[in-house]
Amino acid sequence: MHKILLVIFAGVSVWAFSPSALVNDARAQIGVTLRYDPSYSRIDYPMGDVAVEKGVCSDVVVRALRVQRIDLQRLIHEDMRANFAAYPRRWGAKTTDRNIDHRRVLNIATYFTRKGYAVRDEFAAGDIVTWDLGGGLTHIGIVSDRRKGDTPLIIHNIGHGTQEEDILRKFKITGHFRIY
């Protein structure tokens, strides 16, 4: 009996997610990721990344989750490869591209929704939020454990490197996700 249980547990991967660690891992990018750079880059797979001193809003989320051992590059690539029609066609792609798919806000939101991470609760530290900035622009950030009054701050990169700012209600919220 004990040998059977050991075999069963050996095949189960243990995943422990910490919202406070996610916030700290995002905050650690402040002063490191210094500029916004949306240029296309060929990157390693899995666990590929552009140079840490640059990036876009989604890179803040991707990098913080990687410290939690969650590789959105691999997860989104695999889900898109198996379910390509479920993802936005906004970029005219006819197939997946593991260099960029995980860096697109709409793809991240689609993946999180498909996995059941969308919530309607109050915002909590470690939650991930997406916005419509208008003009076809989207944005993503991580809810901080710090507040300005009653409003949680957001850790994000909207053009000047990774910052922690009061922008939660500045733009139209299009998604609210909790992956723990």
Predicted regions and their residues:
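Low-complexity, Gly/Ser/Thr/Pro-rich intrinsically disordered linker/tail segments
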Residues: 150-180
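A structural signal for short, hydrophobic beta-strand segments that form beta-sheets
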Residues: 72-73, 143, 172-175
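N-terminal capping segments
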Residues: 15-113
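Sec-dependent N-terminal signal peptides
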Residues: 4-12
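...with weaker cross-activation on analogous glycine-rich loops/strands in unrelated enzymes
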Residues: 23, 81-159
